[in-house]
Amino acid sequence: MKLTDLPDSRGHFGPYGGIFVSETLMAALDALRVEYDAACRDPGFMAEFEYELKHYVGRPSPVYHARRLSEEYGGAQIYLKREDLNHTGAHKINNTIGQALLARRMGKKRVIAETGAGQHGVASATVAARYGMECVVYMGAEDVARQAPNVFRMKLLGATVVPVSSGSKTLKDALNEAMRDWVTNVESTFYILGTAAGPHPYPMLVRDFQCVIGRECIAQMPELVGRQPDAVVACVGGGSNAIGIFHPYIPHENVRLIGVEAGGSGVASGKHAAPLTAGTPGVLHGFRSYLMQDENGQIIETHSVSAGLDYPGVGPEHSYLKDAGRAEYVPINDDEALAAFHDLCRFEGIIPALESSHAVAQAKKLAPTMKKDQVILVNLSGRGDKDINTVAKAAGITL
């Protein structure tokens, strides 16, 4: 079976993925899979999805040659896929529009979501307003504090934001609560999962909705440089922006795919969120993948300066691509990401999300090892307005 043909009918990417949930959710997931299969074969559904991406989101997003950044770093030419220019400021909206159209197709009037950085919460609240649905967003209490502007945005858009105070009070705990809500209200509620993780069919359908990123790049790069890039770099938390740009490139064997995890305070410190670098396979949130866990299988608390990467698992397709050797995964620590954030601000006039700054930081390491006529394509997954407070605090500045 080719890498691009996965998952199999049971949602497996080799040993990863699958469905590990309570009986209550099995029927809901099966109904979702059946509805999604039908939607994919329905030209009307796909046409509406594409219409919304063009006229509501503002796609295609441009690919931009970061000339001054390339000069500063030396070596390869750096190009940025500008997902930060989408409506709501990140790649998340590609997926929430697709899932909201599915929810409407299934007759669901209430949607729920989990969020870390708040971008998926904002994108979910946005599409709920767009299609006239009730929206509840679960968010770790620590992230509510870190991402106050996005919390207010969600409320402006009509969503109810529920702070989650259990565990580490971050994305993992928000996801737990969202799944509890779904079990309780499965008849009326559609769960808009924010990343390419969770039980089947979510990793597949989120990837499919995000693949617009990579498909656009494959069309755009020859116009800009006459060929495809030598390397594609994207940050990986759950991994939806990365799989969205990686997946269409999988058959292009001479294109390196590099996923960048949150190295936090350094992998050796144990305070990080890099399961592909330092984790082991296990089951969490309904799927099997590389996880941050101890020898007893208990989830270890994660750390990252970036709320959106602060997750102890990763999408199952990334785990499979790692094992298959088709993609490579590297950690970038907080300080490196913050430095890259400032670089992009100063040299290109672009304020990136801290998540995306991890990918820029990897380009900073990679570019000098390559020739001047080689090309790195960085997925700039979101803009950094939401992170201004965090960046100021890291610099000892009070806003």
From Swiss-Prot:
Gene3D superfamilies hit by this protein: 3.40.50.1100
Record keywords, A-Z: Amino-acid biosynthesis, Aromatic amino acid biosynthesis, Lyase, Pyridoxal phosphate, Tryptophan biosynthesis
Cofactor section: pyridoxal 5'-phosphate
Gene Ontology terms, MF aspect: tryptophan synthase activity
GO CC, any one term: cytoplasm
Pathway where this protein functions: Amino-acid biosynthesis; L-tryptophan biosynthesis; L-tryptophan from chorismate: step 5/5
Catalyses which reaction(s): (1S,2R)-1-C-(indol-3-yl)glycerol 3-phosphate + L-serine = D-glyceraldehyde 3-phosphate + L-tryptophan + H2O
Broad EC category: lyase
Family matches, as InterPro entries: Trp_synth_b_CS, Trp_synth_beta, Trp_synth_beta/beta-like, TrpB-like_PALP, TrpB-like_PALP_sf
Domain of life: Bacteria
Positions where N6-(pyridoxal phosphate)lysine occurs in the chain: K92
The enzyme's E.C. designation: 4.2.1.20
Coiled coil: none
Keyword Ribonucleoprotein: no
Record note on quaternary structure: Tetramer of two alpha and two beta chains.
Function recorded in the entry: The beta subunit is responsible for the synthesis of L-tryptophan from indole and L-serine.
The family this protein is said to belong to: Belongs to the TrpB family.
Protein name (database record): Tryptophan synthase beta chain
Gene: trpB
